[in-house]
Swiss-Prot record:
Record keywords, A-Z: Disease variant, Glycoprotein, Glycosidase, Hydrolase, Lysosome, Signal
Superkingdom, taxonomy of origin: Eukaryota
Enzyme class name: hydrolase
Subcellular location: Lysosome
Record's protein name: Beta-glucuronidase
Catalytic activity: a beta-D-glucuronoside + H2O = D-glucuronate + an alcohol
Gene symbol of the encoding locus: GUSB
Residues forming the catalytic site: 450
Tagged with keyword Glycoprotein: yes
Effect of residue 166 to H: In MPS VII; loss of activity
Provenance organism: Canis lupus familiaris
Protein family membership: Belongs to the glycosyl hydrolase 2 family.
Amino acid sequence: MSRGPAGAWVALGPLLWTCGLALEGGMLYPRESPSRERKDLDGLWSFRADFSDGRRQGFEQQWYRAPLRESGPTLDMPVPSSFNDVGQDRQLRSFVGWVWYEREATLPRRWSQDPGTRVVLRIGSAHYYAIVWVNGVHVAEHEGGHLPFEADISKLVQSGPLSSCRITLAINNTLTPHTLPPGTIVYKTDASKYPKGYFVQNTYFDFFNYAGLHRPVLLYTTPTTYIDDITVTTGVDQDTGLVDYQIFVQGSEHFQLEVYLLDEEGKVVAQGTGSQGRLQVPNVHLWWPYLMHEHPAYLYSLEVRLTAQMAAGPVSDFYTLPVGIRTVAVTERQFLINGKPFYFHGVNKHEDADIRGKGFDWPLLVKDFNLLRWLGANAFRTSHYPYAEEVMQLCDRYGIVVIDESPGVGIMLVQSYSNVSLQHHLEVMGELVRRDKNHPSVVMWSVANEPTSFLKPAAYYFKTLIAHTKALDPSRPVTFVTNSNYEADLGAPYVDVICVNSYYSWYHDYGHMEVIQLQLATEFENWYRTYQKPIIQSEYGAETIAGFHQDPPLMFSEEYQKGLLEQYHLVLDQKRKEYVVGELIWNFADFMTDQSPQRAVGNRKGIFTRQRQPKAAAFLLRERYWKLANETGHHRSAAKSQCLENSPFAL
């Protein structure tokens, strides 16, 4: 078994272009306003995978120059969704290489005829590398499968008599040592076992590498002079809230800005002018986490109004940004929100479900939030990549605290610490902070999960990466999640909070739950003695197949999962009185992985099944989390199940 040539990606299609053609500037969520419209392109798209030996046929035949159906047979593919589980084709489920999507959209006449209208194509997520054409013209490229990118297509749709546009995407899910997450292409050269050119995609993470258009695709408009970006940071001075804002405008240097902050009743509580300033909010309603306050998740609305006088006449633009006023701080032993100790009792998740894979789905999202609130969870980590923007918006609305993680999972190889990898990781953190900086629910950035941080190049890599993230956003702490030994971890000196994953009596000392308390307590003590920083138990858990029962408990039974959690909780209850500031179970729900003898149709460590039905551990954890909530905050009675009540979901 040998690895292919250094240019493994070349064998699968064009070289990795730089993402310089993606738009610079802001990445505000597309909201409708008096000056802005949007047209969703979700639904059925034409789809075709390039099964040619080199995966080059689509480029050689220029499939983007004509309707995709003219290139050969196509499939109907729902967007958003992963393409892997929708059909019955075994080859497509594990396909690696270029796939092609196409959709024709009819535009409102004003969009195509008004030169004062700017038309933007926005792709919420295309995993992993995407090239975009409109009417056969190349408009954008983007590397990375979890963050949005845009292209201004105004000139293309306003240059002819047509009121429609044909949008074509080529997407490649190949992972290399320099992608995030990393992977390798391994060519099988034994002719007695494998056909010529046979290769496999190796990954270093434990979830399925779903691919496709995972999040909404849409068109939206702005005026040609428009609000491009808004940055908000908040503070508190006694009972006065402080909202510092900075607004960026594109299209003209001559404009006026008015800024209004409205409370939940629509009353203006503060106002200002200009591109930057500070708003003071007397008798402020703070944004509090779920179960930490009787009135959690209070959101103000920041209304920004732009006016400009252009040669063609006056221009105006309006944008409304939800704002939660809160503070975050870290001490040697505490994580503070609004100056009060906050204890994370929550989950790790995945964007994963039957059939849709990682595709965004509103019913699934609402179900998950209902379960989180029922569970008494106040937090989750976006393991192991940024989640959809709509997820973050619901976290803002319902007070669910977020550790926002980059796709830096599986950084194992020395090559993945190269300057090429570091530069890409810096760019990804820039995109992540740009997208999520204004969410009050986001209280900490996580730059990676379980890297080989004991390798020598890890010290410079994480020192640089964390410093860069703090420079982008000085208002939040930064961490990465480790499973390295406390003495060997070269990245830990640079984090603000120690996040540790451990699986005592699961991945070692199989079945011996009696050693958990000693091993876990020793690990906590070693980490704290070395770094004097607060600690989060960022992962722990056990594989459990729903309906398997054994007493005395045996591995994979529901009883074993419960017993393991109980042993962890005994130590957590001791150490949370000292320096442990949180616990996040692995995992919220079962999820799909690559096939292997160690995985029975995916990872079964969920406290819920993949279909969101509870295992016995869910009830154990619910009892614990409501008990923790009773000790740490003001909330409704734990006897009452929590759900999303009377929510219009008008995000």
